[in-house]
Amino acid sequence: MKITISGTGYVGLSNGILIAQNHEVVALDIVQAKVDMLNKKQSPIVDKEIEEYLATKDLNFRATTDKYDAYKNADYVIIATPTDYDPKTNYFNTSSVEAVIRDVTEINPNAVMVIKSTIPVGFTKSIKERLGIDNLIFSPEFLREGKALYDNLHPSRIVIGERSERAERFAALLQEGAIKQNIPTLFTDSTEAEAIKLFANTYLAMRVAYFNELDSYAESLGLNTRQIIEGVCLDPRIGNHYNNPSFGYGGYCLPKDTKQLLANYQSVPNNLISAIVDANRTRKDFIADAILSRKPQVVGIYRLIMKSGSDNFRASSIQGIMKRIKAKGVEVIIYEPVMKEDSFFNSRLERDLATFKQQADVIISNRMAEELKDVADKVYTRDLFGSD
């Protein structure tokens, strides 16, 4: 089969490479530089498995900027374009997804389109009715940035928002490329699948917020956070995972998904969902106040990225801390080797790590790094377990 991937971010590339082990895959992107890299078997994003598979595996994979070449004769088109959250409308910006749907409908109306981008609850049903089309399925992704292909090779589950033969064929494409066997697979309706994605990510955000509030409590009262978390997590119903305190949840998915779900609750009584969003804001206030209490002249931000093994710092929690500190008039310098710019939000980027360490009175790091251990007395982090 010919499978086209529209969008070459984490979601698109990981799905494309997974399927290209067994089928023809054409990746479509509007950025020529990314297409050129992919055709040279180089990854435009930081992801260990994507880089490895592109360089060493026998993949039936190519990239193009030509939508006619990409969509023509495709059996499936996977839509993995960005859907950023718009705070003005309280809604995902689905314009890129809609543009792909219109293009595919014009060029190859027989292709089955599968939306992998995160979308509002009810979007698939609504656009099918609005455009008078039926060949559209939603299938949520559950991957981590920096480990996107790994998570597709070893998926926790596969969810397809349709119960049909074509949905089963698409699930088989994902199962065929995976290393994991006997993957739990759920076939449901499109609107339920959309809700599954948002509620799953909101639960993860809630868990992050819970352990962060536990940590704020312990730090305020001089208690040992690690001992409390270890004791709480001995209960198998809670489990000893996803429990490492941080500066708040961040990244591309959790902040926008929680806010979108909250917007979907406008006509439904709720307390918990809104509390999760508020708790994340409160945590950043708490962290910023703790840093400012040290009365630093210069605060060093060690890495803007959200987690190790990633090159993405969209909506990373440390940016919220940085903005709060700058608002109090404290000078901020940044060490972020993946950035080519000289400044970020009017704060200087220091390229030399030794100079960065020397100039900062306090260094804040969401996760502790080996290269900071020689200045551990300067470092402020809430990382207890060395995990994301």
From Swiss-Prot:
Residue positions binding NAD(+): 2-19, 29, 34, 83, 118, 145, 252, 256, 314
Pathway linked to the protein: Nucleotide-sugar biosynthesis; UDP-alpha-D-glucuronate biosynthesis; UDP-alpha-D-glucuronate from UDP-alpha-D-glucose: step 1/1; Bacterial outer membrane biogenesis; lipopolysaccharide biosynthesis
Keywords in alphabetical order: NAD, Oxidoreductase, Phosphoprotein
Annotated protein name in UniProt: UDP-glucose 6-dehydrogenase
UniProt PTM: Phosphorylated on a tyrosine residue. It results in a significant increase of the dehydrogenase activity.
Top-level taxon: Bacteria
PANTHER family according to UniProt: UDP-GLUCOSE 6-DEHYDROGENASE (PTHR43750:SF2), UDP-GLUCOSE 6-DEHYDROGENASE TUAD (PTHR43750)
Family the entry assigns: Belongs to the UDP-glucose/GDP-mannose dehydrogenase family.
Organism, scientific name: Escherichia coli
